[in-house]
Protein backbone atom coordinates (compact mmCIF):
# COMPACT_ATOMS: atom_id res chain seq x y z
CA UNK A 1 0.00 0.00 0.00
CA UNK A 2 1.42 3.34 -1.07
CA UNK A 3 0.88 6.32 1.16
CA UNK A 4 -0.85 9.09 -0.77
CA UNK A 5 -0.25 12.07 1.51
CA UNK A 6 3.51 12.53 1.80
CA UNK A 7 4.92 15.23 4.05
CA UNK A 8 6.01 18.44 2.34
CA UNK A 9 8.26 21.05 3.92
CA UNK A 10 9.53 24.47 2.85
CA UNK A 11 12.99 25.60 3.88
CA UNK A 12 16.19 27.39 2.98
CA UNK A 13 19.26 25.72 1.45
CA UNK A 14 22.26 26.12 3.75
CA UNK A 15 24.74 23.82 1.95
CA UNK A 16 25.13 22.38 -1.56
CA UNK A 17 28.71 21.08 -1.36
CA UNK A 18 27.80 17.40 -1.68
CA UNK A 19 27.08 15.69 -4.97
CA UNK A 20 23.31 15.57 -5.66
CA UNK A 21 22.60 16.45 -2.01
CA UNK A 22 21.51 19.67 -0.34
CA UNK A 23 21.11 20.54 3.33
CA UNK A 24 17.83 22.35 4.01
CA UNK A 25 17.06 24.24 7.22
CA UNK A 26 13.41 24.04 8.29
CA UNK A 27 12.19 26.74 10.70
CA UNK A 28 8.90 26.16 12.54
CA UNK A 29 7.04 28.06 15.25
CA UNK A 30 5.98 25.99 18.26
CA UNK A 31 4.15 27.11 21.36
CA UNK A 32 5.70 26.41 24.76
CA UNK A 33 3.27 24.16 26.71
CA UNK A 34 3.51 26.09 29.99
CA UNK A 35 4.42 29.67 29.08
CA UNK A 36 2.32 29.85 25.88
CA UNK A 37 5.06 31.72 24.10
CA UNK A 38 5.97 30.94 20.49
CA UNK A 39 9.50 29.69 19.91
CA UNK A 40 11.40 29.27 16.66
CA UNK A 41 12.56 25.68 16.31
CA UNK A 42 14.88 24.77 13.44
CA UNK A 43 16.19 21.49 12.10
CA UNK A 44 18.44 20.56 9.21
CA UNK A 45 17.65 17.71 6.82
CA UNK A 46 19.51 16.32 3.83
CA UNK A 47 17.55 16.20 0.58
CA UNK A 48 18.21 14.61 -2.80
CA UNK A 49 18.74 17.12 -5.65
CA UNK A 50 19.04 14.97 -8.79
CA UNK A 51 19.65 17.82 -11.28
CA UNK A 52 21.65 20.00 -8.85
CA UNK A 53 19.54 23.09 -9.58
CA UNK A 54 19.43 24.66 -6.11
CA UNK A 55 22.13 26.86 -4.61
CA UNK A 56 22.84 28.18 -1.11
CA UNK A 57 20.18 30.69 0.00
CA UNK A 58 17.38 29.38 -2.24
CA UNK A 59 13.92 28.76 -0.78
CA UNK A 60 12.87 25.20 -1.72
CA UNK A 61 10.04 22.72 -1.29
CA UNK A 62 10.99 19.15 -0.34
CA UNK A 63 8.91 15.98 -0.05
CA UNK A 64 9.32 12.82 2.01
CA UNK A 65 10.52 9.79 0.00
CA UNK A 66 11.90 6.32 0.61
CA UNK A 67 15.38 6.21 2.18
CA UNK A 68 17.97 7.09 -0.47
CA UNK A 69 21.01 6.78 1.82
CA UNK A 70 21.82 6.65 5.52
CA UNK A 71 20.74 10.28 6.07
CA UNK A 72 18.59 11.20 3.05
CA UNK A 73 14.82 10.72 3.32
CA UNK A 74 13.73 13.87 1.46
CA UNK A 75 13.82 14.95 -2.19
CA UNK A 76 13.68 18.35 -3.86
CA UNK A 77 10.35 19.12 -5.55
CA UNK A 78 10.90 22.69 -6.73
CA UNK A 79 12.85 25.87 -6.11
CA UNK A 80 10.40 28.51 -4.90
CA UNK A 81 12.75 31.52 -4.79
CA UNK A 82 16.24 31.96 -6.20
CA UNK A 83 18.79 33.98 -4.27
CA UNK A 84 19.69 37.10 -6.24
Swiss-Prot record:
Domain of life: Bacteria
GO cellular component: cytosolic small ribosomal subunit
Keyword Repressor on entry: no
GO MF entry, a single one: rRNA binding
Keywords noted in UniProt: Ribonucleoprotein, Ribosomal protein, RNA-binding, rRNA-binding
UniProt similarity note: Belongs to the universal ribosomal protein uS17 family.
The protein's role, per its UniProt record: One of the primary rRNA binding proteins, it binds specifically to the 5'-end of 16S ribosomal RNA.
Protein name as annotated: Small ribosomal subunit protein uS17
Native species: Borrelia garinii subsp. bavariensis (strain ATCC BAA-2496 / DSM 23469 / PBi)
Gene designation per UniProt: rpsQ
Amino acid sequence: MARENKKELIGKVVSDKMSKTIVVEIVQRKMHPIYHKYLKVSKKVKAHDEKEVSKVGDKVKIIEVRPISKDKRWALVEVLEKLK
